[in-house]
Amino acid sequence: MDVVTVEHLTKKIGNKTILEDISLTLKRGHIVGLVGANGAGKTTLMKVILGYSSFQSGNFNVIKNQDSKSNIGALIENPGIYPFMSGYENLKLLNESKNTQDIDKIVSQLNMDEYIHKKAKTYSLGMKQKLGIAIAFLNDPQFVILDEPMNGLDPKAVRDVRELIVQKAQEG
C-alpha cells in the first residue's frame, strides 16, 4: 500500500532551486534511505513531506490509516526535547495513548532504562538521539521519517536502533 506519494515536487529559496521535479512513492513496511551530498536537499524533502516547509510546484499525498494512533513519526536534526524534563517526562508528554506501557516498551527496546529518569539536559548527543528516535516511534505512526538516525550513536546503540527500525517495518 502506498503511504506517501510525491509527484514532480519543486522547491526554491529565492532564485536557488533546492528540489527539482522530485517524484517518489513510499510503501507501507518499506525502509527507504535518501542518499546524497551535503546540501542536496534530503532534509528539505523530509521537511516538505512533514509539512514544515512549503514548495512551489508539484504535489504530495499522505494516506491516513485509521488504525494508526499517529500518521507520521519524525526525527529531524536537533529533535525538540524539553531539556529540563526527564526523558521519561518528554515521552509521557508526547504519548497520545497515555499508556505508560508504550513508553516502557520503547525505552526497553532502545536500552534507555539507565538514564530515562534523568533530566534531558544532562544527556550526551547519543542519548538525545535515542530519545528523539523513541519519540518518533512512540505513538505507533503509520510511517517514520528519520534524518540521520545513527548520528552520535555508539555501535551498540546503532544495533538497537537498526533492530527497532526493521521490527517496525516488518510490523507494517
Segments and roles (model prediction):
Residues 4-6, 19:
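Conserved structural motif at the start of ABC-family nucleotide-binding domains
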Residues 35-37:
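The feature captures the beta-strand-to-loop junction immediately N-terminal to the Walker
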Residues 50:
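Helix-to-loop junction immediately C-terminal to a conserved catalytic motif
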